[in-house]
Every structure is written in structure tokens, then in C-alpha cells.
Regions:
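Glycine-rich, proline-tolerant flexible connector loops at the mouths of alpha/beta enzymes
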Residues: 28-36, 47-69, 101-109, 194-203
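Alpha-helix-loop-beta-strand connector modules within alpha/beta enzyme cores
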Residues: 61-82, 115-127, 213-221, 305-307
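Hydrophobic or amphipathic alpha-helical targeting/insertion segments
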Residues: 87-128
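N-terminal active-site wall of soluble small-molecule enzyme domains
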Residues: 42, 46, 55-95
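N-terminal amphipathic alpha-helix/helix-capping segment at the start of soluble metabolic enzymes
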Residues: 1-27, 121, 307
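Conserved, mostly hydrophobic/aromatic
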Residues: 25, 81, 129, 196, ...
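Catalytic alpha/beta core domains of metabolic enzymes, predominantly
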Residues: 117, 128-131, 143-147, 151-313
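Active-site mouth loops of central-metabolism enzymes
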Residues: 20-38, 57, 76-84, 140-141, ...
Length: 380
């Protein structure tokens, strides 16, 4: 893995983003922000899942008012997601949010952007410049207030970076230039509490846009694949796109966008980071895929253990194996392991047999050892 790109560090609430801070995991509420009770409940659920930053949609003034109450009832850093109307950003700052997300594709009046920047600067609140393929300004119209139609703006006719002829303007150029336009406004006002995202559904477009931006600005990058899909397809797409960038040392905070429970976004985000050894938060599960040699339902066992491990915060490696071929070896390499079969299970701790139990007792015995290991690591 390549050395991480060191960006300018900023603080989103009490979470440091960029610099040498760990890559943080964030999500977005899927409730109607105007429903305070439902939104607060979802935020608290996200916190329990390990989420470090939460973004809320702010479509109107009623949502802004609700945001103020949500802020009073929660402690996690909150980001106000703003589109179309700069006044919503100004009022969200009054509500006490920790960061703004502005879309340079649909707030393109320079004067209005400047108003928001001045207020954010006075409060030392960061701004994420969030460029999305689905809301890019018209080709030739970056920074112009006219032309909002996605059907006649020329964006869909732009070639991908890999398909463009030498010197030909590509969709990646358009994404990056849109971001740089708004970055320029912020920099002219001596505002540098900047975070940037450049999202598309297409992995090649997204990865190339982030690579280019990483080369020309010092600011932290928020990674994401937009509208990535359901829990299964979206997790795979996000793991590939985000994983490529993170492996190259690019990225300071991530959001896995899924058409699913927001907590799944958090779990998936941490799994991506743990797989690259960028975070050591929570248990890591090693499980065999099962085959004809297994005489225990490994799939059911592994999924049950995986669900139970979600509450474990220590970086424990847990192995679930179903036969004698790789089971003992893999289990011995884990902090806690189980090799099951023939109506019994061997529980391992740090490579040593801890006990042999009946199959009916293996789950409870395994989790007893996991909790003991968790307590030992937490104490250290």
C-alpha cells in the first residue's frame, strides 16, 4: 500500500479529518429531517454502530428549524446537506451545525456562495465542496447561474477520461474544474477549512477525478461512490472504488452510500478500512466458505457470529472454521477461534486449545472467550 497523502487537517466538530488523523467513517440519515424524533433515533443508532460524523438533508426552512433541535439532542458532529438555496446554509449555521456541504452544481451564484463562506469563516465551520456527476453544471457553464437541465447541458455527451482523445475535454475534467471553481472562491476569501468530494456512480470516473484533485490541492478528501446500490451490490462497488483510492493513499473520510439501513453503511465502511489495515476498530471475522467436508452449517454459524461481533469494539480477530483442513491453522492464528465438526467444537485462544464443547454450546462458549479477550484489550 502506498504512503498516505498528507492533507491539511480540519476539525468537523470534535473529529479531526485529514493530516495524520485516522480515516473517519460517516453516514447520512434517511429520515425526514423535519421528523426530529425519528432523526434523533436514527443518529443514536448510527453512533452505536460506530459512525463518527452524520449528515442530514436540509431541503427547506422547516428542516433547518428541526436541525436546531436535533443539534440540541445529539453530540455527534452534524453536517447540513445543502442544495439550491444558499439561505438554507446560512440558517443551518445558526442552528449550530459542525460543517456544511455545498453543491457547486446547483448553487452557482458567486455572490451567494461568498455570503455563506463569510458566515462559515466567522464561526470557523468547515465547508465540504460536494461535486456530484448527477448535478454538474452545463458544459461551458461552470459558475454561471443559467442552464440547469440535465437533458440539454452537454454533460452526458462528455467522454470518460480513458475514452477521451488527447486534449479532449472529459467528464473528469468537468468534475474537477467544477470543484476548483468553488475552491477558488473560498481561497479568495482566505477560507481554508475545506473538504472535497467528487462522486459519480462510475468507478473509473470517480477514481480518476480524486486522483487529479489530490495532485492539485492540499485539502482533505471525502470519498464516496454515489448511488452505489443495495447492500450487496453497493458494498461491492464501494469497496472497489474506495479501496482503490485508499490503497493509493488517497482519502481522509468515507461514506458508503447504500439503499439500506444507514448502519450498514457504517459497518461496510469500517470493513473496508479494516481490510486495508487503516483502522483497527471492532472485530475482524475470518470464516471459511464451507464445502462438502464441513459437517456443521458454517454459513449460518459465521453469519450469526458476525452479527454478534458488531458490538465488540476491540480489534479482535475471530476465526470460524468448519473442518480439519484449514480450521485449526486459521483458528490458531486468531485471537479467538472455533473449529467445528462431528458434533463438537474446539475453541482456541491465541493459538492454544481453550476448551472442547458440544456443538449445541459452541456459540455461547465462543462469545464467552470473545468477551474475555475484548475486556483484556480494552483494559490495555
Amino acid at each position: 500500500m502506498r504512503k498516505r497523502r498528507i492533507s491539511k487537517a480540519i476539525n468537523v466538530g470534535d473529529v479531526r479529518v485529514g493530516g495524520d488523523a485516522p480515516v473517519s467513517v460517516q453516514s447520512m440519515t434517511k429520515t425526514d429531517t423535519r421528523d426530529v424524533a425519528a432523526t434523533v433515533a436514527q443518529i443514536k443508532g448510527l453512533e452505536e454502530a460506530g459512525c463518527e460524523i452524520v449528515r442530514c438533508a436540509v431541503p427547506d426552512m422547516e428542516a433547518v428549524k428541526a436541525l436546531a433541535e436535533i443539534r440540541r439532542q445529539t453530540t455527534i458532529p452534524l453536517i447540513a446537506d445543502i442544495h439550491f438555496h444558499h439561505q438554507l446554509a446560512l440558517e443551518s449555521l445558526e442552528s449550530g451545525v459542525d460543517c456544511l456541504r455545498l453543491n457547486p452544481g446547483n448553487i452557482r451564484d458567486r455572490e451567494k456562495v461568498e455570503q455563506v463562506v463569510r458566515e462559515a469563516k466567522a464561526r470557523q465551520v468547515p465547508i465540504r465542496i460536494g461535486v456530484n456527476f448527477g448535478s454538474l453544471p452545463p458544459v461551458g457553464g461552470i459558475g454561471l447561474t443559467r442552464g440547469l437541465s440535465r437533458h440539454a447541458d452537454g454533460v452526458d455527451k462528455l467522454p470518460k477520461a480513458g475514452e477521451a482523445d488527447a486534449g479532449e475535454y472529459s467528464v473528469v475534467d468537468h468534475i474537477v474544474q467544477t470543484g476548483l471553481w468553488e475552491i477558488g472562491i473560498l481561497e479568495e476569501l482566505d477560507f481554508d477549512l475545506i473538504k472535497i468530494s467528487l462522486k459519480a456512480f462510475d468507478i473509473d470516473t470517480t477514481v480518476e477525478a480524486y486522483r487529479r484533485m489530490a495532485d492539485v490541492v492540499p485539502y482533505p478528501l471525502h470519498l464516496g461512490i454515489t448511488e452505489s446500490g443495495t447492500a450487496k451490490s453497493g458494498s461491492i462497488r464501494s469497496a472497489i472504488g474506495l479501496g482503490m483510492l485508499l490503497y493509493e493513499g488517497i482519502g481522509d473520510t468515507i461514506r458508503v452510500s447504500l439503499s439500506d439501513d444507514s448502519r450498514e453503511e457504517v459497518y461496510t465502511g469500517f470493513e473496508i478500512l479494516k481490510s486495508l489495515e487503516l483502522r483497527k476498530a471492532g472485530a475482524v471475522l475470518v470464516a471459511c466458505p464451507s464445502c462438502g467436508r464441513a459437517d456443521v452449517d458454517v454459513v449460518k454459524l459465521a453469519n450469526t457470529v458476525d452479527e454478534m461481533l458488531k458490538k465488540i469494539k476491540s480489534p479482535i480477530k475471530v476465526a470460524v472454521m468448519g473442518c480439519e483442513v484449514n480450521g485449526p491453522g486459521e483458528a490458531k492464528d486468531a485471537d479467538v477461534g472455533i473449529a467445528a465438526g462431528a458434533g463438537r467444537a474446539i475453541i482456541f485462544r491465541k493459538g492454544q486449545k481453550a476448551r472442547i464443547v458440544a456443538e449445541a454450546d459452541m456459540l455461547s462458549a465462543l462469545m464467552e472467550e470473545v468477551k474475555t479477550a475484548d475486556a483484556e484489550l480494552s483494559f490495555v
